[in-house]
Amino acid sequence: MATEKKLEELFHHTLQDIYYAEKQILKAIPKMAAGAKSPELKKAFEHHKDQTEVHVTRLEDVFKMIGQPAKGVKCDAIEGILKEGEGALEDFGK
């Protein structure tokens, strides 16, 4: 029984990590799209934004199914990736 509880907690925490990451990506995509030089890349960012919105909605559905509020917890991995992306935008903007 204790193992089931631990797995449930791990699942919930992982959902929170993913939810946080997807929400942060949604915030970052407009900045990345604005920094894109080619129309094709801008379009790709818009498409990715649409897909990410679907991911967020699906995650919110999963939270409802398990009876938990849709809430993220800070994910250091996505923070690092987004920081790297900001650096790339600065480098290419020069």
Where are these regions (language model features)?
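Amphipathic alpha-helical hairpins
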Residues: M1-K94
